[in-house]
């Protein structure tokens, strides 16, 4: 049997960028390093990062009891409210949101402010969809 691996096999560039950012911070940071949610849906990578001292924060309220440090936003992105809450807690926020996802955030923010209704096809509980919806001013549908 012949096995052929597609040229595009592996992580997209946004995920690679986010994972590389966390590994770099884990090696260089002089303060605690956290990720908001697992940086990637890959338990092996998450486990390796944990061994390097990176902790996963699953809810914003956890930040209140953690030593201040750097928190890295995963490639899925987050809502405006979450972003502001992280800064308000005194953490240095490093944004590893995929540039394509950031573009979507800016577009839904712009068009929702102009009165457009934003409709997103997807699982409303998926972190990327939650993040996108978090930049919609008012009217939205999923």
Please state what every model-predicted region is.
Residues 37-54:
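N-terminal beta-loop-helix "entrance" segment that forms/cooperates
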